[in-house]
Amino acid sequence: MTDIIRSDAATLAAKIAIKEVSSTEITRACLDQIEATDETYHAFLHVAADEALAAAAAVDKQVAAGEPLPSALAGVPLALKDVFTTSDMPTTCGSKILEGWRSPYDATLTARLRAAGIPILGKTNMDEFAMGSSTENSAYGPTRNPWNLDRVPGGSGGGSAAALAAFQAPLAIGSDTGGSIRQPAALTATVGVKPTYGTVSRYGLVACASSLDQGGPCARTVLDTALLHQVIAGHDPRDSTSVDAEVPDVVGAARAGAVGDLRGVRVGVVRQLHGGEGYQPGVLASFEAAVEQLTALGAEVSEVDCPHFDHALAAYYLILPSEVSSNLARFDAMRYGLRVGDDGTRSAEEVMAMTRAAGFGPEVKRRIMIGTYALSAGYYDAYYNQAQKVRTLIARDLDAAYRSVDVLVSPTTPTTAFRLGEKVDDPLAMYLFDLCTLPLNLAGHCGMSVPSGLSPDDGLPVGLQIMAPALADDRLYRVGAAYEAARGPLLSAI
């Protein structure tokens, strides 16, 4: 079983195709690992053992009959962040207000996974409605980092990242609003990608901030992440923000990058994202070593200035709460989810107020209040409107940078994983943890976090963030795969 759960997805898929191992064996091994370890890590909110084994058996039947498999990852099981709707298991978004709720339909991303023959092991833990950087805001308890049980796995999608690091699944799906895929990947020594906004359908992705949210792939290698990216990306007419454009050849780029030649690739180091107050020395040392490695691979490295990045955090934490206050208005105790106080003696307004008070956690309430204030008649121009102007300037900074470089790089996070409870009572410190990742969400561009080693400060994982323009996701995979190959294998968490 150990060999199976520690294998990469591409290897497992190849073995399934030649009947060296069955999808059922792989899926059962993952389920056994979840059963043996998840009491410790709490990566999963719901485990769908019967459904996953049925999907695996269907792939095995196709293999036995000599039928062509539906995708390059057919039969390889996956952990799904509990923010994507699934018709056959609960979708809670880490919130009490949706406890036990089952969607009547699958998200487009979920449907594409099923069509690709990928068994879904279950739904992973997350910060409530994807609001947080540590997975401590989940109404169902925190997830622990497999590298150190006293540390957070990142957020909001810490469950998916922890499942990968704990060898509970070879593949995972996350969503990224301000770094929720990339940041947990950095803290757990896994690979996570935020695709270009609009290239992976948001239909059935329960909204946090609609102009920022983007589903994306997570795995333990760059190639596995590319293979999963290829499955989930593509135009969806049911999503009004979906981009009708050809999906870049991310798999081809990953395979080409693995050769380890970056000659002719121009890499920009973002001056605003590598140093200054709040950066851990070990993270900076790891980043500098990664830049040296890229140079050794033949890349042309230069420093790039993105002056408005200094205002990205302030703009983000006005735009995001504003969209949250609008999106979460739908949880009104009338149509679905929790209902409190409906005993026939209270008005609809009273029931709604009681339900939202009981169903939402402190961080969600905080962001609803901030957003409502920012959108109010007297303050809209002073706050929300100004934040949107800064957003435009950040996008222009990136556009200008890409006229002289092909990709940008930075640390994924300013520090390694912090201790559980360390930032719970200090929201600003928690928000600062997204400093390096959120500019890409504001601009709609794509980004990857790839492991860059362990910090000399505390021996915990550090991530290298690679950034590219919209619809140039293949550049991430070429550079990421080349760096991964040169870096060599890392020690595992367990």
From Swiss-Prot:
SUPFAM superfamilies: Amidase signature (AS) enzymes (SSF75304). PROSITE patterns: AMIDASES (PS00571). The keyword Cell membrane does not apply. GO terms for molecular function: ATP binding; glutaminyl-tRNA synthase (glutamine-hydrolyzing) activity. Its EC number is 6.3.5.7. InterPro entries: Amidase, Amidase_CS, Amidase_dom, AS_sf, GatA. It is an enzyme of class 6 (ligase). It catalyses: L-glutamyl-tRNA(Gln) + L-glutamine + ATP + H2O = L-glutaminyl-tRNA(Gln) + L-glutamate + ADP + phosphate + H(+). Keywords: ATP-binding, Ligase, Nucleotide-binding, Protein biosynthesis. The active site is at residues 81, 156, 180. Allows the formation of correctly charged Gln-tRNA(Gln) through the transamidation of misacylated Glu-tRNA(Gln) in organisms which lack glutaminyl-tRNA synthetase. The reaction takes place in the presence of glutamine and ATP through an activated gamma-phospho-Glu-tRNA(Gln). This is Glutamyl-tRNA(Gln) amidotransferase subunit A. The lineage of its organism: Bacteria, Bacillati, Actinomycetota, Actinomycetes, Mycobacteriales. The gene is gatA.
